[in-house]
Amino acid sequence: MRTLLIFSITVVLMSSIVVSQLIQPENEIRTYIENSVPYIGTEIPRMDRIDGTGIKIAVIDTGVDFNHPDLFGWGPDGKVIGGHNFIEENQLPMDTNGHGTKVAGIIAADGNTLGVAHKAKILAYKVSEDGEGVSSELIRKAIEKAIEDKADIINISLGVNKTNSKIDSAVNHAWDNGIFVVTAAGNDGPELKTIGSPGRNFESITVGATYNNMTSSLIAILEIDETQYTVIPMVGSSKTQEPIIEKIVFGGFGKNSDLENLDVKDAILIVERGSDIEGELLFFSIKEMNAAKAGAKALIVYNNQPGIFLGELIHEFSEPGYVPQIPVVSIDREEGLEIIKTIEKKGLGIMNLFYNPDFIAHFSSRGPVSPFYIKPDIVAPGAYINTTQINSSYNFTSGTSFAAPHVSGAAALLLQKNPELQNDEIKSLLMTTVQPVSNAYGQEFSLHESGSGRLDISNAYKAKLIINPTNFVINLSPNQLSIEKQLEIKLIEGELGKINVKFEGPEFIEFTHNIKNNNLLMELNIIGEKFGEHEGKIFINHEKIQYTIPVLIHYTEGSISAYEENEKIFFEINHPDKWSSAKITVTNSKNGNTYSITATPDKKTSLEIYENGEYWIDAKIRVDENISNAFDTIKITSLPEEMKLTNIPEKQIILVILAIIIIGTAGLFIRK
């Protein structure tokens, strides 16, 4: 009896371990027009009566208020022609939160406001009641239902802070079924590596957020002794008529008592956020009034905790009739303390606040998500967007949730104009015809922040070239100093004629090209020894349209190369210094399945593969106590059709085998 009990406990324990590994926990997902719609160029297609007619766009969100006059009607004759309520079965997907209604309005409002594709129809899939959280399983079900309902485009303006294989797999399924999928990047910026699923999905077009029009796109610069600082204008701040060039003065917390014995007349005052008295509410508006009263020309508020923040001067607790008198910006704690620490040594500060709509919103999530592809793909207006709200109202709102529907609407216009377009062709037209986006100092944002650039529907609509791929990630090393790449150019109409090609990037990268059979053949050569990650752009000019193809270059000290033989991938590692080991991670680009293996210099390293596809290879080469990265890609096409007995990943198979061994061993003891 005792041995039988031990055997039973063993079976239960091992089964629970295996099951826990096989079941992926549910992840809580957070939901992340007025001027923005014409700003991105909708007037050009509207002149041709291209308005989204005949296109069905699935909105996976909090539902849609189909009683709103701009989104009126449920059923075949309404704006919202179908959908599903995954929160309350047998109920219509009516929005009681507002998030989904805002998204749908940007896409297809048709009334007092006009969405990007105002004659398109909406499929509403309600996966959240309050906009705060929803399980990944509901997102997956909604995507599958959109496929079943034959949506043309899916808009997903919500996501998680990490990879979610359920959502990514469903997005891939939709993409493979010819449905164009648009995802929001998320609102966890300005830090890098903040894009989660489904925004990190390789196939979907991932959208970050910019400002939009000239009245709500205030940005700021702060320079001290030629050092440039990142500052954010507070909401309600006034702009400067001209740059303010004055001394910097530290004013404690910005109280009257902090300033009464200081000479702050005409100065740029810097103060700390909050108060030195616990529980005291020292609003930014109070700090601004005190600074202006003391004669300061501008105010900087540095954070009282790590990171930067967006402050508001005008709020419900502001004094009646309060109007800010001087420009006010926020800065992160580290930079604020740096300014204060060296304030006596530094010269004059230069502050300027001005309008720039093509500026990445501070909240917009950034990449990278992988060394092998670029995210976000594109940016669009997502700050201070005036759109539809529940209860027949309108409201200003901000977030990448509201940048994504601009792109969904744009895709609808292109698809109406040319119904034969494939997903990668729509993606190309949107991503290669963008406008550049630059920071407050006139420097273009990095690819990890802005992707290809800001959506320009008028250019995408007029474009005659479909160029693929839409960007390149190139891996070079001293072992491989040059690489050849090819751009395929497809004409939508007419003849190719004359095109001009140029490359802008680091001076130590040499670029040559020629055109053959409507293909652009290129060679990039490294002529310097600057290891690291570098960015460039290829520009193609054709019939007054400029096409932009970003290039991300990894120039690494070590290298890894891969080749296929007998259904295995073999790896060769090179490094100028003596290396002891390398951890190699191989990822199937289509399904995300990942495999790892360790290589050493004294043995040949290989990995068995079971399906065709493109594989991304990431090697972390150990040299003494340092780690050196190296990358490669390989495309496998020679394998027979996949005949896998199970879809259980390798780790879980090992656990199952281990369970069988333990159970078998326990059984032997029982028999004895």
Regions found by a protein language model. Give the residues of each.
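N-terminal domain-start motif of subtilase-like serine proteases
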Residues: 21-59, 66, 84-98, 260, ...
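C-terminal subdomain of the subtilisin-like protease fold in secreted/lumenal serine endopeptidases
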Residues: 34-35, 153, 206, 326-342, ...
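Subtilisin-like peptidase catalytic core
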Residues: 87-162, 208-213, 251-255, 267-284
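Structured lumen-facing ectodomains of secretory-pathway proteins
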Residues: 194-376, 380, 390
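Surface-exposed binding patches on compact interaction domains or structured appendages
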Residues: 440, 468-469, 493-521, 580-592
